[in-house]
Amino acid sequence: MMEIGDLLNGKYRIEKLLGKGGTGSVYLCTNIELGNKWAVKHIPSDMASDKTMSEIGILKRLYHISLPRVVDIFRDEQGLYIVESNIEGTDLDSLLKRRGSFAVDIVVDWSLELCDILKYLHGVRPNPIIYRDMKPSNIMLTQGSRLVLIDFGISKEFRRFQSKDTFLAGTRGYAAPEQLIKGGMTDQRTDIYNLGATMYQLLHGRPPGLKAGGFVPSKDRVMLRINDIVSRCLENKPEGRYQRAEDVKQELQSVKNMLVVDGARKRLVYKLEVVLVVVLSMVSYAITVMGLFSK
């Protein structure tokens, strides 16, 4: 049993327990040699499965500002330890529980960031990384207002010669149909579906797979457009979805441009209304003054 103050691998001093899950615990630790802080995952020996080693193998290959970075791996008699970036912030699921949903401009900006992350993962060579578990609880909003994707526990390397996945993986409510059927094959279009489910919840306060009702009716052109984008991401058949994260990004950028235009239009209308009020006030004042002088 590890305690606060214990030294791991001779240099990582445990400061506090960050969290505990089914496969192990995560501690905030200070590197006593460098003085910086890291998140250290401890996985007991009997829990260190092939899936765990696969996650480590994937994370070791990645280097992106919006992804955790693995800097050290070691073992002792108590199990396996993974030292990675300490992400300070709040996950989007916690924010949703407080707020209910988010304004469309915020969702568009966040979704553009998520598209960039997926574009990076899908561009890894020789084997692209399929994340497979995008959902609000796996997305951290840092203190610097940047999104970071966490928990690569069910991610996989996409190998073109494989015809099906070796195990079912995904979170109901966010998972694409191919993630939940035996013999299904996940690829980058699976991540597009997960992205669509996440966008849906950020906009409407619930994931699309939990309640019936579809999209909230709207006459707003921006909302109609983004609902169309989300709807295409959520197509049951992979060939009906956007095929690349870049395709989704381009569509979202067009929505962002619409928001800019609409914002400029609203500001112009507001200024004209102010000018009109001022002019009418001046006219009213002039009429009043003229009336006084005519008496």
Regions found by a protein language model. Give the residues of each.
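Conserved N-lobe ATP-binding subsite of Hanks-type protein kinase domains
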Residues: 25
